[in-house]
């Protein structure tokens, strides 16, 4: 049976990136890592915290949000995990199109519609990709 490798990252959908950026930085003392037009990444005491700005969705409609919890899996266990989810009748969602440098993910929902992700990449992989490809972003280190 496949095993989870640990928590990968937390992502929250926010209606106002500036307001949320200040809250997580100033109130929770999260350390800013990168900020783009619609996203920001923090180190929250060793945890990768991501904010995605989604201003036009109802805040009470979870099904419309990209907000999710992601767990780390190995690249080698990716297919095993996919088969495991299918075997248990889990609803697997079509993930966003992404570069190979952004690694691989399986998105799925629980019976109440809460989104989860099994991800093979790391924060360092993502930041390296963004540094090379996303020139509009501001990096803090």
UniProtKB/Swiss-Prot annotation:
EC numbers, comma separated: 2.5.1.-
A GO CC term attached to the entry: cytoplasm
InterPro entries: Fosfomycin_Res_Enzymes (IPR051332), Glyas_Bleomycin-R_OHBP_Dase (IPR029068), Glyas_Fos-R_dOase_dom (IPR004360), Metallothiol_Trafse_FosB (IPR022858), VOC (IPR037523)
Protein name: Metallothiol transferase FosB
Keywords associated with the record: Antibiotic resistance, Cytoplasm, Magnesium, Metal-binding, Transferase
Cofactor(s) required for function per UniProt: Mg(2+)
Role noted for this protein: Metallothiol transferase which confers resistance to fosfomycin by catalyzing the addition of a thiol cofactor to fosfomycin. L-cysteine is probably the physiological thiol donor.
Enzymatic class: transferase
Main location: cytoplasm
Annotated Mg(2+) binding sites: 9, 68, 117
Organism of this sequence: Brevibacillus brevis (strain 47 / JCM 6285 / NBRC 100599)
Family as reported in the entry's similarity comment: Belongs to the fosfomycin resistance protein family. FosB subfamily.
PROSITE patterns: VOC
Localization annotation: Cytoplasm
Subunit structure, as described in the record: Homodimer.
Gene it is expressed from: fosB
Family annotation (PANTHER family): FOSFOMYCIN RESISTANCE PROTEIN FOSX, LYASE, PUTATIVE-RELATED-RELATED
